[in-house]
């Protein structure tokens, strides 16, 4: 893709108004299974395997994985409304199959839907993009809190994420895991597709090794 074509693409998905929290989509209720992209008890693309030689263990694994999916929202609103009839949801299903399915024989998979920020947010030079990402983070934090309180049952857990999900995972680890009682159950973070500056290990999650 040439620079000109990419700039045209960004122009096409640029929201036409500033971010306004009062006009944001309703926040998801994570006690409702419909607001999860993946759960151990519900069949979905997270249980995809390449062929019949692979086995799947959907639940009763000794470890959980909390997965934050990448950006799949390329539209002119700042945040997705999580409508399962829109293309963003189809992209989420694709990444469940080609990313988090890697854990489907070893971990119980939990992946929240969230009001992800539009891809344009990463290129916005004003405060709108950051505000959209902040809104997305509030969903991830609430989903994680619900997961810990209602689904995890004190098991060890992994954080897995990609792209926008990885960026939000950095913040989640800082706000909810680093230097908390959860740290002793936290096995590792597999967060790819977004840079992790070396200074983060001292400033953002200093107690995570």
Name each model-derived stretch:
Residues 4-30, 67-156:
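Active-site catalytic motif of lipid deacylating hydrolases and related acyltransferases
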Residues 33-54, 92-98:
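Short alpha-helical segments and helix-capping/turn motifs at coil-helix boundaries
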Residues 68-69, 160-162, 189-194:
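Short His-Asn-centered micro-motif
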Residues 96, 168-177:
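Short, well-ordered amphipathic alpha-helices
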Residues 161-165, 169:
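Gly/Ala-rich beta-loop-alpha elbow adjacent to hydrolase catalytic centers
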């Amino acid at each position: 893709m040439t620079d000109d074509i990419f700039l045209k693409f960004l122009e096409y998905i640029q929201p036409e108004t500033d971010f306004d929290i009062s006009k944001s989509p309703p926040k998801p209720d994570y006690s409702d299974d419909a607001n999860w992209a993946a759960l151990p008890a519900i069949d979905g693309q997270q249980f995809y395997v390449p062929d019949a030689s692979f086995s799947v263990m959907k639940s009763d694994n000794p470890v959980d994985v909390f997965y934050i999916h990448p950006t799949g929202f390329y539209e002119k609103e700042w945040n997705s409304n999580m409508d399962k009839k829109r293309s963003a949801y189809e992209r989420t299903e694709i990444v469940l199959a080609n990313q988090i399915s890697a854990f489907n024989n070893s971990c119980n998979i939990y992946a929240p839907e969230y009001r992800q920020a539009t891809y344009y947010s990463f290129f916005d030079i004003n405060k709108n993009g950051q505000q959209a990402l902040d809104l997305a983070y509030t969903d991830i934090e609430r989903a994680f809190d619900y997961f810990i309180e209602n689904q995890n049952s004190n098991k060890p857990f992994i954080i897995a994420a990609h792209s926008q999900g990885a960026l939000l995972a950095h913040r989640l680890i800082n706000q909810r895991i680093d230097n908390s009682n959860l740290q002793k159950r936290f096995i590792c973070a597999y967060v790819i597709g977004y840079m992790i500056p070396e200074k983060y290990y001292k400033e953002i999650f200093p107690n995570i090794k």
